[in-house]
């Protein structure tokens, strides 16, 4: 149905989630992350009705009309594009332009949530009222390091690692402008 996002409830089960992580090669797969990702697809379907959005989308993310099933089959059989860190927030984002959008959207929301939570709880210094994404990215770089150390100290995997470079920054900025934040 239109506007319905379906997430398999089994993903909340740790054993199932680990099997999914291994099967999909997504080290940081979580229910919350999957929901963010799928919400990106939903909002893309709405935003893609606007010609101006589509035009800019193609310039930044690529041609969304590339054969989707073939792109995913290629990704799962051969892996991500070798240079994925130079242009994408995750290996999976390199599989298809709409997956790149959904992964970027999801990562954008994760950064906003983590930074706003850390600032609100005063875990890191900064202005919780400043919603400028460039400012929040600068906070994220400090917060990410702290989260890596805390997680490793507790015996957990670190947080997702991705490069904030001109390509990913441009994609984050496009997501933010599309949201109208």
Regions from the language model: what does each represent?
Residues 1-14, 25:
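Auxiliary, metal-adjacent structural segments of Zn-dependent hydrolase domains
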Residues 4-9, 37, 57, 84, ...:
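Generic structural hydrophobic/aromatic packing signal, biased to beta-strands
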Residues 13-15, 77-78:
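Short, positively charged
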Residues 14-36:
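Short pre-active-site segment immediately N-terminal to the catalytic Zn-binding motif
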Residues 16-23, 82-89, 126-128:
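Short glycine/proline-rich turn/loop motifs
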Residues 29-49, 102:
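Active-site recognition of the HExxH zinc-binding catalytic motif
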Residues 46-115:
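Post-HExxH zinc-binding segment in Zn-dependent metallohydrolases
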Residues 92-181:
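Pan-zinc metallopeptidase signature
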């Amino acid at each position: 149905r239109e506007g319905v996002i379906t997430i398999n409830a089994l993903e909340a089960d740790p054993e199932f989630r680990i099997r999914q992580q291994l099967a999909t090669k997504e080290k940081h797969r979580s229910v919350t992350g999957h929901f963010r990702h799928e919400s990106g697809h939903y909002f893309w379907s709405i935003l893609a009705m606007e010609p101006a959005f589509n035009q800019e989308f193609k310039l930044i993310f690529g041609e969304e009309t590339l054969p989707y099933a073939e792109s995913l089959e290629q990704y799962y059989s051969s892996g991500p594009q070798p240079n994925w860190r130079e242009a994408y927030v995750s290996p999976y984002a390199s599989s298809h332009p709409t997956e790149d959008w959904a992964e970027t959207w999801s990562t954008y929301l994760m950064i906003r949530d983590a930074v706003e939570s850390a600032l609100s709880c005063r875990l890191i210094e900064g202005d919780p009222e400043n919603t400028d994404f460039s400012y929040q990215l600068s906070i994220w770089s400090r917060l990410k390091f702290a989260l890596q150390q805390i997680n490793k100290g507790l015996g957990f995997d670190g947080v997702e690692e991705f490069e904030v470079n001109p390509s990913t920054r441009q994609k984050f900025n496009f997501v933010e402008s599309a949201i109208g934040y």
